[in-house]
C-alpha cells in the first residue's frame, strides 16, 4: 500500500471532509495534527512516506526536505499554488506536485472582519463586556475614509468592491498594477508613497516571495498617519514584524489587524500577543468548512489520478 502523510491537520478535521476508510485498502494514511519541531524532525517522521498531502504553507517543503525523503513520489498541496514547495527540487527528483482549487472570498471576508473590529474597538469592547463594563471606547465610521490596497488581484479586487459599498475612497498600488482594472473597480491608482501617507486603512493583498518581502518597514510606518490601521491577511514577511511591534508599541500608528506572521504558528511569547492595539487571528483567512471541503476532496482526487498515471492539476511553476 502507498504510504500517505496528511500534514498539519491542526483542528483534526480532515476525516470530516473525506472518508479515508473507503481508501484503506489502497493507502496507508497517517495524520499529523501538530507542527514538526524543525526540518530535521520532519525528515525523520516523513522518511518512509511516498505521498505528502499538505495544508497550504504550514510545513515548508524545502529542497533539503525533498532530497532527504527518498521514497517520496507525490506532493499534493491545498490551493492553486504553494510558494513553500521547492518546485525545482521536486522536478529534479521527478516528484509530481499537484494542487487544488480554492475560494478567495474567505480571505476578503476576514479582512473586513479585522477592519471593522479595529474601527469599532471590538477586542476591547468584547473583553470589557464580559467583565461587566458598558461602552468604554469610541469607534470610527468607514464612510469617507481612505483605504489603500497593496495589491489588486482576486482578493484585493473583492475588498475594493466592499470598500466602495461602504462609501470609502479606494486607492491601490502594486508593482504590476492593472490600470484597466482600477478604472473598472473605481479604484485610484497611486504610488506606494502616496498610498502610505494618505490612507486611513492599509490592507495588503499581494503574494509572498522576495518581491514584496519587507514591503512595510519602520520607514513606511513613520510615513503613515498616526490614526492609520494596517491589515495583513496576505503573507507575514511582507511586513517586517520587528518594525510592526515597534510601531504598535510606540503608537506610531493606531493599530493593526494581522492574520499572517513571519513564523507560524506564532510563538506564545511573541510580543504581538501582548499589544492592546493588535487584533490578531491565527492565519484563518482560508480556514472555512467550504474551503476545507474543496481541499481535502480534491487532494484525494489528485492522489488517485497520480497513482493511476494520469495526474491532474499539476503545478510546474
Where are these regions (language model features)?
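Phosphate/diphosphate ligand-binding glycine-rich loop within oxidoreductases
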Residues: 49-126, 140
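Oxidoreductase and adenylate-handling cofactor-binding alpha/beta cores
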Residues: 108-127, 161-168, 297-305, 310
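Phosphate-coordination loops involved in phosphoryl transfer and adenosine-cofactor binding
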Residues: 1, 72, 143-146, 218, ...
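Short beta->alpha connector loops
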Residues: 10-12, 34-37, 56-60, 79-82, ...
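N-terminal glycine-/charge-rich "phosphate-binding" loop or analogous flexible N-terminal tail
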Residues: 1-51, 55-56
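Glycine-rich NAD(P)-binding loop of Rossmann-like domains
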Residues: 125-158, 185
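Rossmann-like adenosine-cofactor binding region
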Residues: 47, 60-63, 176-271
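Rossmann-like dinucleotide-binding domain for NAD(H)/NADP(H)
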Residues: 97, 227-317
Amino acid at each position: 500500500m502507498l504510504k500517505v502523510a496528511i500534514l498539519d491537520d491542526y483542528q483534526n478535521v480532515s476525516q470530516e471532509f473525506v472518508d479515508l476508510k473507503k481508501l484503506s485498502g489502497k493507502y496507508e494514511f497517517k495524520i499529523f495534527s501538530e507542527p514538526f519541531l524543525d526540518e530535521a524532525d520532519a525528515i525523520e517522521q516523513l522518511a518512509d512516506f511516498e505521498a505528502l498531502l499538505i495544508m497550504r504553507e504550514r510545513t515548508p517543503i524545502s529542497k533539503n526536505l525533498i532530497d532527504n525523503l527518498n521514497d517520496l513520489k507525490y506532493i499534493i498541496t491545498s490551493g492553486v499554488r504553494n510558494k513553500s514547495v521547492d518546485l525545482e527540487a521536486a522536478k529534479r527528483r521527478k516528484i509530481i506536485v499537484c494542487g487544488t482549487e480554492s475560494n478567495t472570498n474567505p480571505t476578503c471576508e476576514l479582512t473586513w472582519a479585522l477592519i471593522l473590529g479595529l474601527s469599532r474597538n471590538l477586542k476591547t469592547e468584547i473583553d470589557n463586556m464580559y467583565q461587566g463594563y458598558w461602552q468604554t471606547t469610541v469607534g470610527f465610521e468607514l464612510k469617507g475614509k481612505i483605504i489603500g490596497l497593496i495589491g489588486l488581484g482576486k482578493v484585493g479586487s473583492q475588498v475594493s468592491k466592499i470598500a466602495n459599498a461602504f462609501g470609502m475612497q479606494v486607492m491601490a498600488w502594486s508593482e504590476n498594477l492593472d490600470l484597466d482594472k482600477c478604472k473598472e473597480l473605481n479604484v485610484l491608482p497611486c504610488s506606494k508613497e502616496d498610498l502610505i501617507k494618505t490612507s486611513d486603512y492599509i490592507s495588503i493583498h499581494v503574494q509572498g516571495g522576495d518581491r514584496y518581502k519587507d514591503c512595510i518597514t519602520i520607514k513606511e510606518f513613520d510615513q503613515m498617519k498616526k490614526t492609520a490601521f494596517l491589515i495583513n491577511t496576505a503573507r507575514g514577511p511582507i511586513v517586517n514584524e520587528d518594525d510592526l511591534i515597534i510601531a504598535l508599541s510606540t503608537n506610531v500608528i493606531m493599530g493593526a489587524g494581522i492574520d499572517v506572521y513571519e513564523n507560524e504558528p506564532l510563538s506564545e511569547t511573541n510580543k504581538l500577543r501582548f499589544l492592546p492595539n493588535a487584533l490578531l487571528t491565527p492565519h484563518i483567512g482560508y480556514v472555512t468548512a467550504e474551503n476545507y471541503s474543496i481541499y481535502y476532496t480534491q487532494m484525494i482526487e489528485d492522489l488517485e489520478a497520480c497513482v493511476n498515471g494520469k495526474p491532474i492539476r499539476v503545478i510546474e511553476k
